[in-house]
């Protein structure tokens, strides 16, 4: 969607994202970010890049993601600096996202730096660079030039979906650790393409949570957020609750649960007892998110992700779908609840807020 905003509206979005007042809740900054993503253009790239000075790894990781999704080569120097991390200010989660964003933009000039950091000491960074190189090389190939993205999923994926196949074959490739990560990612996204209603595909993806790569596990959780399938809820709960799980996986699991915004479906076999970490407490998924949002001993990234996820949940279940930037909206009272699309809950809410502004071109 192409969006035109006035200078005053752009200034409001910028101030919200960059927390100029000093007291903007994190979830409002996230929504401003995705509203800016809908606007696009060089000025947005500059605003989002400025946000990378923020101390929150969670926000910086999301900023890097958006820079990649904007597909604007103006972001390449910024993303390269984040990956290089000369001052040591960016954690591996942020650097990984910068590498993935370079892959999303797909510029051939990014290949040297990505190949360099395929030797990085951090596994998530190494693996992301490997996948990003694979994506750019694929995009530049004859096969890649002829490939068409799945219109059902409005995102630039780290890897293109593999050729259509049956679920057991794709599951085998997904779990085959002897295959290159890029190939396994292609199987992952091909399984995603079966959609939220395919319990078999969701369960095949959930089997990937046993993989030894945190990067791999976090991508599955992200896909579950895209799909919003109730069948993924037990496995996502397990990842969020596991204190030994990597923070980046728990972060994606939390936000996926917030975007799904339901307690799932009743078991087809009531006699099957779920493992304790997959069971819902009284109050359901929202109670779990609220618990981890205030846990003093929870990692900051996990705690903040749950706070954002609670906002997603409340948005998805709100009759009027609250827009934190109400002052921008000329048609607030005319908004209608939109159907879920295959993207994250935060992006859905941001798109609705942009639509409410009545300025979509």
UniProtKB/Swiss-Prot annotation:
Alphabetized, the UniProt keywords read: Cytoplasm, Hypusine biosynthesis, Iron, Metal-binding, Monooxygenase, Nucleus, Oxidoreductase, Repeat
Question: Annotated pathway, please?
Answer: Protein modification; eIF5A hypusination
Q: Quick one: signal sequence residues?
A: none
Q: Which SUPFAM superfamilies match?
A: ARM repeat
Does the record carry Metal-binding as a key word? yes
Q: What is its main location?
A: cytoplasm
Annotated Fe cation 1 binding sites: 61-62, 96-97
In terms of SMART domains, this protein maps to: EZ_HEAT (SM00567)
Superkingdom of source: Eukaryota
Question: Which GO terms of the molecular function aspect are on file?
Answer: deoxyhypusine monooxygenase activity; metal ion binding
Cell compartment(s), UniProt: Cytoplasm; Nucleus
Function, as annotated: Catalyzes the hydroxylation of the N(6)-(4-aminobutyl)-L-lysine intermediate to form hypusine, an essential post-translational modification only found in mature eIF-5A factor.
Q: What is this protein called?
A: Deoxyhypusine hydroxylase
The record lists the organism as: Cryptococcus neoformans var. neoformans serotype D (strain B-3501A)
């Amino acid at each position: 969607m192409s969006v035109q905003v006035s200078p005053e509206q752009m200034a409001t979005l910028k101030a919200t994202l960059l927390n100029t007042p000093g007291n903007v809740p994190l979830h409002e900054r996230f929504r401003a970010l995705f509203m800016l993503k809908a606007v696009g253009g060089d000025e947005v790239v500059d605003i989002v890049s400025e946000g990378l000075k923020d101390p929150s790894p969670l926000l910086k990781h999301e900023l890097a993601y958006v820079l990649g999704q904007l597909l604007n080569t103006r972001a390449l120097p910024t993303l390269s600096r984040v990956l290089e991390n000369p001052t040591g200010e960016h954690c591996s989660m942020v650097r990984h996202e910068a590498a993935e964003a370079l892959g999303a933009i797909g510029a051939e000039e990014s290949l040297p730096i990505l190949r360099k950091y395929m030797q990085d000491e951090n596994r998530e960074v190494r693996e992301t660079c490997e996948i990003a190189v694979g994506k750019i090389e694929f995009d530049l190939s004859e096969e890649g030039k002829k490939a068409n993205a799945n219109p059902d999923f409005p995102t630039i994926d780290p890897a293109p979906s593999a050729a259509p196949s049956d679920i057991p074959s794709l599951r085998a490739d997904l779990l085959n650790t002897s295959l290159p990560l890029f190939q396994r990612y292609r199987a992952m996204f091909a399984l995603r393409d079966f959609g939220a209603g395919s319990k078999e595909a969701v369960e095949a993806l959930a089997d990937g949570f046993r993989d030894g790569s945190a990067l791999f596990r976090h991508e599955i959780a992200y896909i579950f957020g895209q799909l919003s399938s109730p069948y993924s809820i037990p496995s996502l709960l397990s990842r969020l609750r596991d204190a030994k799980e990597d923070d980046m996986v728990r972060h994606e699991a939390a936000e996926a649960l917030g975007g799904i915004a339901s307690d799932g479906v009743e078991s087809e076999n009531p006699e099957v007892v779920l493992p304790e970490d997959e069971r819902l407490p009284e109050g359901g998924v929202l109670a779990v998110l609220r618990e981890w949002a205030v846990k003093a001993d929870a990692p900051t990234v996990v705690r903040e992700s749950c706070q954002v996820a609670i906002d997603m949940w409340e948005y998805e279940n709100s009759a009027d779908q609250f827009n934190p930037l109400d002052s921008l909206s000329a048609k607030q009272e005319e908004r209608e609840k939109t159907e879920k699309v295959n993207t994250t809950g935060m992006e859905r809410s941001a798109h609705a807020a942009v639509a409410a502004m009545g300025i979509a071109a």
